[in-house]
Regions:
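A solvent-exposed, acidic/Ser-Thr-rich amphipathic alpha-helical stretch
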Residues: 2-12, 23-78, 87, 99-102
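Short beta-strand edge/turn micro-motifs at domain boundaries
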Residues: 104-132
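A mature extracytoplasmic/lumenal domain signature
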Residues: 87-88, 125
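Beta-strand elements of well-folded, non-transmembrane domains
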Residues: 90-94, 111
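A short acidic/glycine-rich loop-to-helix N-cap element
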Residues: 95-102, 131-135
Length: 135
């Protein structure tokens, strides 16, 4: 399988994990020991990262129905490493009623090809995408 295609397949799995509220499906896209530098949350490293991410997602999915749209600007391959960047648009609809919110973040993901041939995220970084202000 082409490497760019394989990363796109993994990103589809990531998106569908959010869209079905399946924390395990989302976490499956990450390497067993990855670094999570998500905006607004403490950084997580190594073996601690998957468990903390899973717990965060389980809480999120318990409180909200989620719909994720991924906008990939580029996927860049470099041997057994790759990175991709773009935007995530996450729609949060409260399960107990209330106003739906849209959160748009910029992201950068570093990927590594595993011995199995699958691509997994080894570092995740995101931050809020703020509108440009004209001076």
């Amino acid at each position: 399988m082409d490497d760019t295609y394989a990363i796109n397949v993994a990103k589809t799995e990531y998106r569908e994990g959010f869209n079905t509220g399946d924390a395990d499906r989302v976490v499956s896209v990450f390497a067993p020991e990855f670094t999570d530098n998500s905006d607004g949350r403490p950084s997580r490293y190594g073996k601690d990262a998957p468990a903390k991410l899973r717990r965060y997602l389980e809480d999120l999915f318990a409180d909200y129905r989620t719909q994720l749209n991924i906008i990939i600007a580029a996927i860049v391959l470099a041997g057994d490493f790759a990175y991709d960047y773009g935007w995530y648009e996450l729609t949060l609809t409260p399960r107990n009623g209330g106003e739906t919110r849209l959160i748009r973040t910029r992201y950068l993901e570093l990927w590594r090809k595993q011995e199995s041939g699958e691509w997994r995220i080894i570092r995740y970084i995101d931050n809020n995408d703020l509108p440009d202000v004209v001076d």
